[in-house]
Each structure stands twice: as C-alpha cells, then as structure tokens.
C-alpha cells in the first residue's frame, strides 16, 4: 500500500514537499485515506477543523489557508474516486485562467471547472468571470464555486438566482450535505 504522502505527490494533489504538504501531513493527517468520515462533507469538516485547531495561528496565512482548503477538497475527490482531476489547470483557448480543479466526466466531453475559496467576499466575481470564459469556449461546461462560509454562500446564491452571475452553475458550502449531492452527481 502506497503511503498517503506519496499519493499526495504522485497524484499532483500537492506538487512536492512544501509548506502545504508539511501543514497537511502534520496538522490534518499523514494518511488521508484513513480518516473516518461517512460522507464527503464530514471529511471536509474533519480536515478543516483539524487544521483550524491544531495549526498555530502564527503559521496561518490567507495563502496557506487557501492551499490547504484546495488540498482538502482534492483529497476528498480522490477518496470518492473522482478522477481524472487536474489541479491548477489551464484549459486550451481559455487564456489567463488557472482553474483550481478541472474534471471531466466519462459521458461528457465538456470540462467541469471548480473554484475553491475559503471565503467569498468579492472573490465570487473572479470565479464567475473564469466560469464565463470557460463556457465561452466550451458551451456545455459546468462551473461550481465551493466555499467554507455558509452565510456567504447563501448571499452569493441569491445573486446567482437573480441572474447577477452568468457563468457559475452552483455555489456550494463544502461542509454541508449539498456538497455530498455534488459529489454524487
């Protein structure tokens, strides 16, 4: 059995032994496959709570928070067998956009873009612009914004519902059962 840390690198969930790698393996788990969680959103909750409570406040930065959250979501997708998965991916003919995660379903040839944000504030606008760019090239592309802040997610969902956002299909809080629904689709 391959060590989880080897899987983190070999699947490109993490690009190597760096600060994110060290943080994930030290404060969350050295083997993410052994974490007991009955569904994806509980896995996200467990991992994020471990990071929040165990990692010293002085070590946390907004950048590290974002990278750790991306790693948590990516390891969750891996655990659920959602592959292939491309991290920090560029899509042909979609210039100047690095998608947090790009997926492809077997039955579809269109990409699924996933934008991952620890908090939304104004960041949902960037995610929507990236989604519009992807849909401009790949008409049937799907785009999802995943965040941790349920209250912010509810606010931005209203903008999606009233038509203020054009590219995003859904906005989901990763620590809710709605995330489980997305994973099962």
Predicted features, each with a name:
Residues 1-72:
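Interdomain/boundary linker segments immediately adjacent to catalytic/signaling cores
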Residues 63, 79-95, 104:
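A short acidic/basic microdomain associated with nuclease active sites
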Residues 90, 114-118, 146-149:
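Short His-Asn-centered micro-motif
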Residues 101-103, 107-118, 127:
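Conserved catalytic cores of phosphodiester-cleaving nucleases, focusing on short active-site segments
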Residues 117-130, 154-156:
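Active-site-adjacent loop/helix micro-motif of nuclease/hydrolase catalytic cores
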Residues 132-141:
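Arginine/glycine-rich "motif VI" loop of SF2 helicases in the C-terminal RecA-like domain
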Residues 150-185:
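Domain-level recognition of nuclease-like catalytic cores that cleave nucleotide substrates
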